[in-house]
Every structure is written in structure tokens, then in C-alpha cells.
């Protein structure tokens, strides 16, 4: 069995309602995959297929509705659903996800 090849990986809090679900975020040629830590209340893994991604942008994280650090990765799907992750180096994540979506379109994966 071959190990998956990740374009990027790092610690991330996925924003689910009022909870920031801590874990790791992985980007490969097909999807963004969030794997929560075992200590979270919400432990369900979440995968976003790159073919579902309409746009990716860097946005400000909010605390009690107040914009704070510009360290949030917002992924908008073609369905209109928005998924947000608090990450380190959000700008680099945006570039890598955009590049992976473009590469997937070129190769016919998307």
C-alpha cells in the first residue's frame, strides 16, 4: 500500500458552528481532508473534493464577531456551502489549494 502524497499539511481548526475543531488539514491532488484530534467533542473527519471547490480565499478569523487575525482559509463550494479553517500561513494555503484545483481541472480529475 502506498502512502498518500500531500501537497500541503498542517495543524488546523475547522470552524463548525461555535466550535473550532482542532486537528490536521491535508491537501492532496483530489481533496482537502480535515482529521480532528481525539480530544474534540466533534470527531468526524471532513473531506472536500477539489472538484466541488468554487473559490478559496484568506479571511479574518473572528472572536465574538470581532475580526481578528487574517489566518483563516475560506473554501466556498459550488453548492454555496462555506468551510473555514484557521491555519498557519493562510496565504500559502490559498495558493496551494488554488493550484491543486487548477491542476486537477487540467488533468481531468475535476
PLM feature spans:
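Short acidic, Gly/Pro-enriched loop/turn segments at secondary-structure junctions
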Residues: 39-42, 57-71
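Short aromatic-glycine motifs in intrinsically disordered, low-complexity regions
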Residues: 35-47
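Anionic N-terminal interaction surfaces
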Residues: 1-29, 46-47, 67-70, 77-81, ...
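Phosphoinositide-dependent membrane-docking surfaces
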Residues: 32, 47-62
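Hydrophobic alpha-helical segments, principally membrane-spanning helices and signal/leader peptides
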Residues: 13-14, 34-36
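Short, hydrophobic/aromatic-rich beta-strand segments within well-structured domains
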Residues: 33, 73-74
Amino acid at each position: 500500500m502506498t502512502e498518500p502524497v500531500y501537497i500541503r499539511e498542517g495543524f488546523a481548526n475547522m470552524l463548525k458552528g461555535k466550535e473550532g475543531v482542532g486537528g490536521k488539514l491535508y491537501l492532496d491532488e483530489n481533496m482537502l481532508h480535515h482529521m480532528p484530534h481525539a480530544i474534540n467533542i466533534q470527531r468526524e473527519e471532513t473531506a472536500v473534493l477539489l472538484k466541488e471547490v468554487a473559490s478559496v480565499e484568506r479571511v479574518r478569523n473572528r472572536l465574538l464577531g470581532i475580526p481578528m487575525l487574517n489566518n483563516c482559509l475560506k473554501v466556498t463550494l459550488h453548492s454555496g456551502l462555506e468551510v473555514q479553517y484557521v491555519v498557519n500561513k493562510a496565504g500559502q494555503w490559498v495558493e496551494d489549494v488554488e493550484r491543486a484545483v487548477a491542476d486537477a481541472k487540467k488533468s481531468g480529475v475535476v
